[in-house]
Amino acid sequence: MTMEPERNRIYRMDCMELFSQIPDGYVSMILTDPPYGIRYQNNFARCPHPPIAGDSGIDYEQFARESYRILRNDSHAYFFTRFDCYPYHYNCLKEAGFSIKNCLVVEKGTVGGIGDLQGSYANNAEWLIFCQKGRRTFNHTPLLQNRKKEGTRPRPGANPSKRYKTRFNACWFGTEYPKATYNSVWQKKHRIYHPTIKNAEFLSWLIQISSQPGELIFDGFMGSGSTAVAAMMAGRDYLGAEIDPAYCDMAVKRASEFRKEALISGPVTE
């Protein structure tokens, strides 16, 4: 009999291997940035880094099917993507059974880009495919405050405005939204370098919108551990894998340090 994986743990292994240990409907939300097969490598933040292990591509069709299997009914899933990978990823997720609701476009913390930057537009946004297994409504959160004073009626007979917004746009740009990634100044200050590092505050917003406290958030490609930190920020548990030993060590250390600072108990191990 296969043992269930531990909550609040980052496993040093391939995501597909971890899938084989996870029962059906075990996780409450998926939030992940799977490899696109582009072997991303640059001198980001003036800290050259090696190619990402496993970034030569995955069997995305199998990945989509397994993601659907382990996700609880009536739950949300977010998959980062790129403009040139989006059609294929969309089709794989749809074939796996997901109901695809939106493609979110979120401003980066710094303008990125490689290749012909004199003949193409610099990439200043992250794309995420937002899916549902069944149907789950968004939580009412205190993340975005309405500009209008609470109780204001825009017209006679209309419902009074609430203090916090209950709907979110598909494009997150501007000062009221957190950026999708950390900029190079943050990376150098914290000595956390990863070519596709995500902003934990931004991820925590998605987690607060799409899950309840104590629920389990899954990320099969933990990278530097932003999803684990974001889950703890929001009072949720996490589970994930990272195949690259160096990044796995970084993720485990980062999660441990956050838990220590926040005085949150629970195991964080490889």
Locate each region found by the language model.
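SAM-dependent methyltransferase catalytic-core segment centered on the flexible catalytic loop
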Residues: 25-76, 234
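Short conserved loop adjoining the S-adenosyl-L-methionine
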Residues: 18-24
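Conserved phosphate-coordination/catalytic loops
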Residues: 10-13, 50-61, 193-201
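Conserved Class I SAM-dependent methyltransferase catalytic core
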Residues: 56-111
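Conserved SAM/SAH-binding loop
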Residues: 12-17, 268
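Class I S-adenosyl-L-methionine
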Residues: 24, 31, 40-41, 47, ...
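Beta-strand-turn-beta hairpins that frame and shape the catalytic cleft
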Residues: 2-10
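Phosphate- and divalent-cation-binding pockets in alpha/beta enzyme and binding domains
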Residues: 18, 84-89, 230, 250
